């Protein structure tokens, strides 16, 4: 199966240290998904192209890669 970049809105907390912590994903139709836990974050290349900060997150019990690429957020998704 082919992976795609799915750009999403993200609600983020920025700590006084400058660290960003994603809290929620927001879909175009208004649905919001709480990010239950951020397991790690580091600079990585995405399988779908691009390079940025990869946040390995638990969202509704599933492990997902959420990327911050310059000033936009995307998920690696099987649906465009």
Predicted regions and their residues:
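Cysteine-centric segments in proteins
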Residues: 1-80
């Amino acid at each position: 199966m082919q992976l795609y970049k799915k750009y999403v809105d993200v609600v983020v907390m920025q700590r006084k240290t400058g660290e960003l912590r994603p809290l929620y994903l927001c879909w175009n139709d208004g649905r919001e998904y709480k990010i239950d836990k951020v397991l790690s974050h580091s600079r990585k290349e995405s399988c779908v192209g691009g390079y940025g900060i990869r946040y390995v997150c638990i969202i509704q019990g599933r492990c997902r890669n959420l990327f911050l690429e310059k000033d936009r957020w995307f998920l690696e998704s099987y649906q465009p």
